[in-house]
Each structure stands twice: as C-alpha cells, then as structure tokens.
Regions:
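Beta-rich, blade/repeat-based domains predominating
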Residues: 132-146, 154, 176-191, 197-202, ...
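Short loop/turn segments that connect beta-strands within beta-propeller blades
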Residues: 162-167, 221-226, 265-269, 307-311, ...
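Short, conserved, GDST-rich strand-edge loop motifs in beta-rich repeat architectures
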Residues: 197-213, 391-409
C-alpha cells in the first residue's frame, strides 16, 4: 500500500501544482501507474522521484512496494533494509504489497529490526494539560519575559495563553482580527510581540470557501493582546505554516502550499517573497542559527540550509541511515537541530551538525513511540528544556472535514524533555 506523500489532514482537500521538474510530478505519475496496476511503470517514476529526493523515506517505501509487486524482490528487500536502518518502513510488516516477500529470510530479518524500532523511547515528563479537547493545537511558543506559553488552534482559529501556574485563558477569541486556522507561532520578548502564522483550512470551524488559499502573519502585542498588524496574501494558493524572527525584528515564514519562504522586513514592514522553493514539496518547520546567518527549512524530503546574506541554499547532508525528512517543528539548539518527525516516524530527534552547519555528524532519538502521542507537532525551547505538543489530534475529523464528537477526543498534553 502506497505511503501518502504526505500532507496534513487539513490540507487533503487542496491540490499542489506539479511540474515536470518537481518531485511531486513524478510521484503523481507513479501513483497513477500504481493505481492502474502498472507496477513496472510506477517503479520507473518513483526511481525518478528518488533521484530528485534521495533521502526521502516515503519515496523509498513506495518504490519498494512497486518493486515487490513487479517481481523485483531483491531490490525491494534492499530498499526496505535501508529504510529500517534509518528508522523507517515500520508499516512493511502489515503491508499486502510485500506478500511475495513475507516468507523469505530477508524479510524475517527486517521484521526483527522493525520490532526493535517500535519500542517506546520515553524521556519526557508532563509539563501541563489543557482540558479543551477540541482545541486541535498545532503551534506552541514561549515568552521569556512573562513566563507564558501560547498555543495555537487549527480548529477554533484562536490562541490560548498559558500562565506559569498552568492556568489558561483565551489570548484571542475565535476568528478575532480575521484569523484563520492558527499554525506556527513565535514570541519575541525583545520587541514584546507574538507572531502567528495563520492559514485557511477546510477543517477550521466556520470555514468560508471564499478564503481558500488565503494566509497571513498576525503580529500581536503580548502585554495587551491587541493586534498590531497583519500581513496577508491574496486568495491564491498559500499555506503559511511556521515562522522565525531575527534579533533585528525581521520575520521569515514558510509557505507549504506554494513552496517558498516569505519575508517581513522590520524596515519596510511589508510581506514579500524571499525565496522561491519550487521543486521542494511542503516547506514546513523553520529555524535560525544562533549567529543569525542561516535559516534551516524543513521540507518533505530533508532540510535546506539558507545563507541569508547570499540568498542561496544547499541541502543539509546526512548519511543514508539518518532521515531528515518531514520535520514538522524544527529548532536550532547548540549547533544542532531538533526535529519533530510525525509522518514517516513518530519521534523527536536531535541532529548534531558539523562546524559549517552543513552536515549531520550524529543523530540522537530523544523521544519515540510514546504511548501518549497523538501526532506530536511543534515545540519550544525554555532554557535547557524542550516543551512540545504531544496530542495535537490533527486527524480528529471525519471524511467530510467535520470534527469528531468530544467523547472521542483527548485533552491537550504538553510534555517536556531535558536537552
């Protein structure tokens, strides 16, 4: 069974355009061939996709499926071994696409590896609980000045403020100031602002189709909760996902639907395209190096290092047994990147970088397969601790995009890890 390449549930009703030079173009062609049971042609197009995104676990998995179904068992086993050695491919045991492999010694060896990978790694403790089950949070931010945390709501299009004692209140009301689904956030204590990325989704409460494709960055005064300014896009194809700010007060935000990074300069106070990332699928998490020279942008197949002065980018390099793909949240900490990988993995990983910040020298799994997890999404660093959303419940909607009944939902759990 093909592994979806991979959009959050709240974007499954939208389409992302694909061109012949894009990974998504070949994935689409491969998927069509798979559905038509032309598995050799499917393998051909997945191979082309993998050439464009050699670290993509999802593409490797799909190619292994196509190989198995077209009778190329040796290549299928080779790819599955690469996947599990990098911590992926956990669905292979139950996947009917690998029926032809399941009695082979090679597949039995893979089963043993998967069993070990599925073991929980739990180093976290409970930070606080929000008993608002239908919040469906995606972003979390911490303000060092007030000691408050902020949680964004995808479903209710609002922001919660959590006091140091764990009590919480609405920082904004639902749809206040024209908010759509609220996604990534950052609190800037120097300027006293909370920046929130907000985008239309079909699953947000009271969604209006006329807003489809709209997105923006909303800047709030932390002390008063007042909207200072919002920077919005026209109704095209945008999904602002996560953002980061510099010491100078500039803001960079990822656009996941029309792959790009946008920029709000403190000097011009306006939203502009900074970097076109056509050819990369679903830019998401974003982080800034401590010296302010480099951005790190996560996408579906890895992480880009962006030189802010030169406005150029390169892919962060990792060995084959280290996967950098699908980091929902991404954070720079002491010459390393912390990524929450919730698509092909169920983990929080720390990627240690070399002095040039270009290559991963070591990976450490901080947390994985925690029984409490219901799609962990993003986090925030407080001192030497990492706080993160453990129960986002991003898929708590039916096939029509309607939220599930409250009795099927869980309280929002925030966990913390010592770094």
């Amino acid at each position: 069974m093909l592994k979806k390449l991979i959009l959050p549930f709240f974007l499954i009703f939208t389409t992302i355009s694909a061109q012949e030079t894009d990974i998504s173009y070949y994935v689409q062609k491969a998927t069509e061939s798979y559905q038509n049971k032309d598995y050799a042609e499917s393998a051909k197009n997945f191979r082309r996709s993998l050439e464009l995104a050699p670290q993509s676990q999802a593409i490797k998995y799909n190619l292994a499926c196509a190989y198995s179904l077209s009778g190329n068992n040796n290549e299928a086993l080779k790819l599955l071994n690469e996947l599990v050695d990098a911590g992926g491919g956990l669905d292979a045991e139950q996947d009917p696409d690998f029926t032809s492999l399941k009695d082979t010694p090679g597949f039995n060896s893979i089963r043993e590896k998967i069993k070990k990978l599925k073991a929980p790694v739990v180093n976290s403790t409970k930070a606080f609980v929000i008993n608002e089950k239908d919040l469906i949070p995606e972003g979390i931010a911490y303000d060092t000045k007030t000691g408050s945390f902020f949680l964004s709501s995808l479903y209710k299009s609002k922001i919660l403020q959590v006091s140091p004692d764990g009590s919480f209140k609405n920082f904004t009301s639902e749809r206040q100031d024209g908010l759509w689904a609220v996604v990534g956030m950052k609190a800037d204590p120097e300027w006293g602002f909370l920046y929130a990325a907000s985008s239309f989704t079909n699953t947000m409460k009271g969604s209006d189709p006329k807003d489809e494709g709209r997105a923006g960055v909303f800047k709030f005064d932390i002390s008063s909760g007042r909207l200072v300014k919002k920077y919005t896009t026209p109704a095209e194809k945008h999904f602002f996902n996560d953002l980061v700010y510099t010491k100078q007060g500039d803001i960079y935000v990822t656009d996941s639907q029309s792959p790009a990074v946008y920029f709000i300069s403190k000097d011009t106070d306006s939203l502009k395209l900074y970097l076109d990332l056509a050819g990369f699928q679903y830019p998401n998490g974003i982080a800034l190096s401590d010296d302010g020279k480099y951005l790190f942008v996560a996408h579906s197949a890895g992480i880009l290092k962006v030189d802010l002065k030169k406005k150029t980018y390169t892919s962060v390099i990792a060995d084959n047994n280290v996967s950098l793909e699908f980091c929902d949240g991404l954070y720079f900490y002491k010459n390393s990147l912390i990524g929450i990988q919730n698509s092909n993995f169920n983990r929080i990983a720390r990627f240690y970088l070399d002095n040039s910040l270009s290559r991963v020298t070591k990976m450490e799994v901080l947390e994985a397969n925690n029984p409490e997890f219901i799609i962990p999404t993003t986090g925030t660093i407080k001192g030497d601790e990492f706080y993160f959303i453990a129960t986002s419940q991003l898929r708590a909607f039916d096939s029509n995009g309607k939220i599930l009944p409250e009795e099927k939902l869980k309280d929002v759990l925030i966990l913390k890890l010592k770094l």
